[in-house]
């Protein structure tokens, strides 16, 4: 940036700039404060989020329980009590393959190993599932597809080990 101004204006601007810091968007913070008002406002707003998100999380967990649990030890997952993610652990060496199978079908997941530093999951087993943005119908369809991809990747791995 550059400023073209008089000496007096430059002194004024230097004084103003001396107290500025690089930080978050103050106007956006002000909008949040005005909208949420206080702790009760934050809690009420978060309750609205919860009402919308719980059915989506339940849909994912239902699909996992119905479609993956009967398959034995091919996957396990977390049961979060809050937050925005479910951690899905597939067979070691399969997370990237599951993500690719999903992508090939048109389903974009958070990258395999994304919860690890530099996205380097040493076991290639972790997928972070975020059912927070899509509609409930989309989450249900995506969960079913994800389960198919987990099962297919597991079968591919088991067959490769037998060969």
Label for each model-derived stretch:
Residues 1-163:
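PLP-dependent class I/II
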